[in-house]
């Protein structure tokens, strides 16, 4: 079983439902080895949580040998990339976790196609690298291999 570290944020005095996130992680096939809840005064545009908090998560992740960090909020593509630069584990936000769960449990062809479409729509703004470079260079989709 994959080891998950859960990260949630208390914003504007509203406490997160960490138990729900734990259940989602279990449904995805993992085991929760730790959790961090941060009180946020404001959302950091670069990391969502603060940089110091991200470094704290990285240290906690290494101590617990967690392979995945699940954030109980939606991360923008740049926030995910920035967190990946600090935290030595796979970064998953709430939406991706839920899409992964649906993917595992879809049985009909229609269901599988709908989940795949949702996953691709989620991943599209997060694509960086050679494929995007080639698309801009040539102007066609035929050179992109995902």
Where are the language model's segments positioned?
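Conserved small/polar residues in nucleotide/adenosyl-binding loops
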Residues: 144-146
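N-terminal accessory targeting/assembly segments
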Residues: 1-100
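Short alpha-helical scaffolding segments that buttress acidic/His motifs in well-ordered protein cores
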Residues: 102, 137-138
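Amphipathic alpha-helical coiled-coil segments
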Residues: 113-120, 124-127
């Amino acid at each position: 079983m994959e080891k998950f570290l859960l990260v949630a944020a208390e914003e504007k005095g509203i406490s997160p439902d960490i138990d729900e996130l734990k259940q989602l992680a279990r449904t995805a096939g993992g085991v929760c080895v730790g959790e961090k809840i941060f009180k946020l005064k404001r959302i950091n545009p670069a990391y969502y949580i603060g940089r110091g908090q991200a470094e704290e998560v990285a240290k906690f992740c290494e101590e617990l040998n967690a392979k995945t960090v699940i954030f109980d909020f939606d991360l923008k593509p740049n926030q995910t990339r920035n967190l990946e630069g600090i935290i030595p584990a796979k970064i998953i936000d709430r939406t991706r976790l839920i899409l992964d769960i649906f993917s595992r449990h879809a049985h009909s062809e229609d269901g599988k196609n709908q989940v795949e479409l949702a996953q691709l729509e989620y991943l599209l703004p997060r694509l960086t690298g050679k494929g995007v470079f080639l698309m801009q260079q040539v102007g066609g989709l035929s050179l992109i291999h995902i």
